[in-house]
A protein has these predicted regions:
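N-terminal structural module
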Residues: 1-60, 64, 70
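Histidine- and/or cysteine-centered catalytic micro-motif in compact active-site loops
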Residues: 32, 46-48, 66-68, 77, ...
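Short, low-complexity, polar/charged sequence segments that are solvent-exposed and flexible
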Residues: 36-38, 61-65, 81-85, 121, ...
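Ordered, amphipathic secondary-structure segments that act as subunit-interaction surfaces
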Residues: 58-106, 110
Length: 195
């Protein structure tokens, strides 16, 4: 997808983004995987999630691209919901390096449900272009795995445990500024899943 000669998604694949949804006074920000195939953009949401609940009432959404793993963690904890603003056309969004204002239209009524993302406008706020940061990437990947823990079989959880130990310890070693987040995640995971 190109906007103003800047390519937001250079290749096909799954991009971790922050999805902002809103209806009335209710807002939500969730990390989701945006599936990109050419110009076809899709997200998959479980029906038990707040994002799904809001999108079926208001299909307008904001897709925020951010290089900051802390934002993903804060969104996972529900700490970004109060940062949602609405554009003049009623699209909910949070600030980020790039924000895509779009409609998320239901495509398949399964669980997870498939939504087609139809872009309306892009807002580019990049004032500096950050280099690829391995620690942020590992932390975001670990957060994806954490969201899968509740739905995985016990034997798969052991494989995820080994992967999480590697990703979290490496993120902490490479970026000491993320240490408090890593320690908090480790404490929560140990308590919740006895890993």
């Amino acid at each position: 997808l190109k906007t103003n000669d800047i390519r937001l998604f250079a290749h096909n694949g799954i991009y971790e983004v922050l999805l902002s949804t809103g209806f009335g006074d209710e807002t939500n920000v969730s990390p989701v995987g945006l599936h990109v195939r050419g110009t076809d953009l899709k997200i998959f949401l479980y029906k038990s999630t707040k994002s799904y609940e809001i999108l079926v009432r208001n299909p307008k959404c904001g897709i925020t691209i951010s290089f900051d793993a802390r934002k993903f963690y804060m969104a996972l904890k529900g700490e970004m919901n109060n940062q949602v603003r609405f554009s003049k056309n009623g699209f909910p969004f949070i600030d980020g390096d790039a924000v895509l204002l779009a409609e998320c239209l239901p495509e398949k009524d399964e669980d997870p449900a498939t939504f087609k993302v139809v872009p309306h406008e892009a807002m580019l706020n990049i004032v500096e272009f950050p280099a690829f940061n391995r620690a942020n990437a590992l932390l975001i990947d670990a957060l994806v795995h954490l969201t899968r823990l509740p739905i995985e079989e016990p034997h798969t959880r052991e494989a995820l445990r080994i992967l999480l130990i590697y990703e979290l310890s490496t993120a902490k070693r490479l970026a000491p500024e993320l240490a408090n987040i890593v320690d908090e995640i480790v404490g929560q995971v140990m308590k919740a899943y006895k890993l």
